[in-house]
Structure formats: C-alpha cells, structure tokens
Amino acid sequence: MRSWLGEGVRAQQWLSVCAGRQDMVLATVLLIAIVMMLLPLPTWMVDILITINLMFSVILLLIAIYLSDPLDLSVFPSLLLITTLYRLSLTISTSRLVLLQHNAGNIVDAFGKFVVGGNLTVGLVVFTIITIVQFIVITKGIERVAEVSARFSLDGMPGKQMSIDGDLRAGVIDADHARTLRQHVQQESRFLGAMDGAMKFVKGDTIAGIIVVLVNIIGGIIIAIVQYDMSMSEAVHTYSVLSIGDGLCGQIPSLLISLSAGIIVTRVPGEKRQNLATELSSQIARQPQSLILTAVVLMLLALIPGFPFITLAFFSALLALPIILIRRKKSVVSANGVEAPEKDSMVPGACPLILRLSPTLHSADLIRDIDAMRWFLFEDTGVPLPEVNIEVLPEPTEKLTVLLYQEPVFSLSIPAQADYLLIGADASVVGDSQTLPNGMGQICWLTKDMAHKAQGFGLDVFAGSQRISALLKCVLLRHMGEFIGVQETRYLMNAMEKNYSELVKELQRQLPINKIAETLQRLVSERVSIRDLRLIFGTLIDWAPREKDVLMLTEYVRIALRRHILRRLNPEGKPLPILRIGEGIENLVRESIRQTAMGTYTALSSRHKTQILQLIEQALKQSAKLFIVTSVDTRRFLRKITEATLFDVPILSWQELGEESLIQVVESIDLSEEELADNEE
C-alpha cells in the first residue's frame, strides 16, 4: 500500500514539474517525433503512440466546435505543423514494422481487419473512398477557403485600420479600445495567413499517406515472396490488411484534424461569441418555415409506395412537432396577456431608436443597409447614433413607424406595388410626389418603368431594403439633435481629453456641460458636422468669457466652422445663389427678441411669421436652390420660423460667408412699410 502511495506522490510531483515547464515538454515531444523516424519501436509503444495521435485529433475537433472565435486558438497553424510531423513519424515507424516484422501492433491489425471484413477488395475500396473524400473534398476546399480568407483579410486591413482611426478621432472609442482593435485586426490577418500556409501541411500529409500505403503493399508483397517464401495470395492478403490498417491509423486522425481546420477557417463569429452548436441551432431556429416545409416534403416521400414510411414519417414529425409546440405556446401567451420580460431585459430608460415594420420588409439586406447608413451619418455629422432596434410586426402591413425614445415621430404607408423610391425636390418630375411631415422633403413611389425614367434623368432611385434605410436616414437627419445630450457630450469630451486634455479642462472651467451640450445640439439640428471638436471647443473657450448666451455662442461656432459648412452646401465651389433678407424684416425680428430667465425668444405676431414664410416660399418657387442669408443676430430666429416646413433650406449669416465666398444675390425679400406699421399697431 505504501509503495502505491509513494508512486502516486512521485507521479504528482512529475506532473507538477511538467506543468511548470511546458516549453521543455513541447521540445521533448518534437525530439521524440524526430527519433521515431530513425529508431525502430516495439509494437506496444506504437499502439500507445497511435492512441495518443487519435486522442489528440479528437480533442482538436471538439475544441474547434466549442470555440466562440477562431482567434481564441491562434496557435492552431503551429499545431497543424506539429501534428503533421508527429503523424508522419508515426507512419514511418509503422511502415518499418510492417515491412520488417509484418506486424505493426494490435491497433493497426484491428483497423485493417475491421475495414477489410473478410473481403480484401471491399477494404481497398473503403480505404480509397476515405482518402478521396479527405483529399479532394475536405482538404482542397479548406485550402481554397484559407487562401481566399487570407487574401481578403490582407486587402481589407487598411480599411479596417482607417475605420478604427476614424472612430478614435470622433470619440466613439478610446485609445485603449482602439489599440485592442488594431491588435485584433493584425492578429486576424496573421492567423489567416498562417492557416493558408499550414493547410499545405495537411494536403501534403494526405498525399504522403496514399504513397506510403502503396509502398507498403508493393514492398511488403516483394519482401514476403522473396524473403519469407509466402505464396502470392498469402502475401497480398497479409500486407494489404496491414497496409490498409496502417493507412487508416494515419488517415482517420488526419481527417479529424482537417475537419477541425475547416470548422475554424470557415467560422464567422457572431456578436454574442457563442460556440458553433449554439449559433447553428439559433440561426436555423430563426427560419421555422424551412423546417416545416422539409417536414412536409418528408411526409410526401413517405406516402410514395416503396419508400420506408416509418423512417420518413418519424423524421417528419421530429422536425414539425417542436415548431408547432413553440407556436402554440406563443399563441397561448398572446391570448392570456403579454409575456413578462426576462430579468436581464428590465433596464431603466427608453429605447433610443426603434424601427417598426412588416415582416415582408425585414431582411438581412435591410440590417446591412441600416448599419451602412448609420456609419455614413456618423462620418457626415460626427454624431454616434444608437443601434436601430427593429421590431417586426406579427402580421404583414404597409405601415412603417419610427420611434425615438418610445415615442412615434414618423409613420408612413408603403404601397405594395411600389418597388422603388425617389427622395428630394425632384420627386415630382417622374410621378405624383408626397410631402413628408416636419419639412423632411418630398418622396415619390415608383414602378419599374418609372424608376428607369428617373434614372434616365440622373436621379438616385432606391430599391428593395434601401428604400427603408433612405427613409430612416431622413428621419434621423430631422431629429439629429435629440441624440446629443449631457451624457453624450461627456462621452465626447472624455474621448477628446486623451489627446487634448488641456483644451477640455479649460472648456470645463469656462462653460458648464449643459451649455456645451446645447451648443452641440443646436449645431447638429441644422446639419452642421461636429467632427472637428477641437475647433468647436477652442471657439467656445475664446467666446465664453465675453458671451453667455448659448444662441450667440452657437453662431460664433458656426462662423468658425464656415469652411466646413460651405463645403457641404457647395462642394463644387460655384457662386452661391442667395436669397437676401431685407433690413425691414431683420429690424422687425431684432426688435421682437425677448430675453428671460427661461431663454431667448421672439415676440413676433403669427401674422408676420406667416408673411415672412410666404415671401420665402414664393422666392423658392422661382429658384428652388437658394441659400437664405441674414444678419448673425437674427439668423437663428428666422431659422425657427422656417424649420417646420422648410427644414432642408439652409439659413446662413453674412459672417459665415466671409469675404472669400462667391455669391450671387438672386432674390431679396422684405416687408413693406404698411406691413411693418401693422405690427407696431
């Protein structure tokens, strides 16, 4: 008993030493693999080594299945090299035993006899099929996937790096997160490149296995007849069984490792970082219609005479019953009331952005288009938009609804036959246009022929899921100011502080964060980009000691951003067509400005607001592309008058134009003395 305890203690100590010196263990394994090529091994040791080879290949296959991200096993290319070397060394050892002793151990003999099964021809055919499947189907396919993945990863690396740099400059991510993302991109590129090269090891190992089997059979038959005086039939049977067993001992672990490599290379990890089985079941379960239709097809096959009814009916029921039970459970819940949300979903606060639509409009293309649109708006405005939560209605409908913080702000019916959409002032050129609410412009639903006609005029036409993302873009631009508040401003300031710490500290000394947030909100509500936060913060620091009114601070920031504003409004640099506001209207607005503790507003009568708006609309009918220009102190109040119905019409101040801008005064508007006198009365 004491001897057994002593052996157990020594074994534990030995394992502890090995666990602390993994480098020595790996080096020893590689040296053993090389020694196996040179020295003959006893059959019992060969059985142990074959078992280790099979065990390790099964471990790798299971690890590949349970991986949530291929980069979690970034050493896999090196493992492929090590396992290939080990397997080739083992093949050489077994081949030596087959040719010298016509006995390569129990496992080789058992594999050969099991596959041959008393019929040598069947055994050769089975072995050939296994080898062809591995070489032509699995190995060739994985090699191609690895090659394409490595190439695309390398080609897309600069774009990913630029995207990370853009997010960092905009304050969407901090420096530590950006460093982590860059390392991930580099590691992914190196991993896929290494996998591309490592698959050559697997391909070469398969070819070597085929050659070794042929050499063993031919060489074994010659040795058996010449040296051991065996008959031809006995030699063929003996060495064929041993050669097939030897080949299978190498090909089956190689097949498992090739399958592991294929799972890892073809894996596209999801956002939730789940293993392969979980993602597979969840994604298939999202398409219950396909399972139901498959069950129907199996049942129809079962009804054909001669087909096995019980087998086909069993699998048909196996597919259909879970879907039916789940739907019945949902219908019971909806009939009895709303199902209680999970505990983790009970988060305070309203959801920022919800898109509610018909199931016929929802698709994977829509998700991609919405993500692309969000990134475009971020690049254009500098506002990091929240994720769009898509709510699919249970029944098909033509209605599309957008909700901001659980409140509907936009609703529209999409005609069933309208496969194309035209947005903008030119929408009425092709067909009957429809005016969107809140000054978001005009749209026109088009048929296919009308869409071709619009494209002939050089107009941008949206089709499919792009129709939805384009409408959502209009809504987001109209309500962009609602996505900038104190919390978002603090986030942007924290991101800027990493590179401009003194600038942010001085800004916080000069202005409270609520005024900074209001300034940014007023800028983005008029589609002024806040990407250049350094210039915006610097301007606020310059003017904050002298000006406390947020309206005027915003105007000074706009003047500082005039190059950005003019470049967006007039990218071609042509003379700006100007609609000039007369002095009478400016003085009228200026005299009506009231400052209170609640803020600054105008006390204009509703009649004069209507008159000013009508004058602007009449001028725009004469020339649709006009830029309204007025004094800096009245610009914001005129914008307040027009934004409800003319949201897309920009209003600038003379100071924003500057002396270097080329302008062309197309129209001037003003109120007559009688109309101004009416206001005084």
From Swiss-Prot:
The annotated topology with respect to the bilayer is: Multi-pass membrane protein
Q: Name where it mostly resides.
A: membrane
Gene Ontology biological process: protein secretion
Q: Which UniProt keywords apply?
A: Cell inner membrane, Cell membrane, Membrane, Protein transport, Transmembrane, Transmembrane helix, Transport
Q: Which Gene3D superfamilies match?
A: FHIPEP family, domain 1, FHIPEP family, domain 3, FHIPEP family, domain 4
Q: Which Pfam families match?
A: FHIPEP
Subcellular location as annotated: Cell inner membrane
Q: Which family does it belong to?
A: Belongs to the FHIPEP (flagella/HR/invasion proteins export pore) family.
Q: What is this protein called?
A: Secretion system apparatus protein SsaV
Q: What is the lineage of its organism?
A: Bacteria, Pseudomonadati, Pseudomonadota, Gammaproteobacteria, Enterobacterales
The gene that this protein is the product of is ssaV
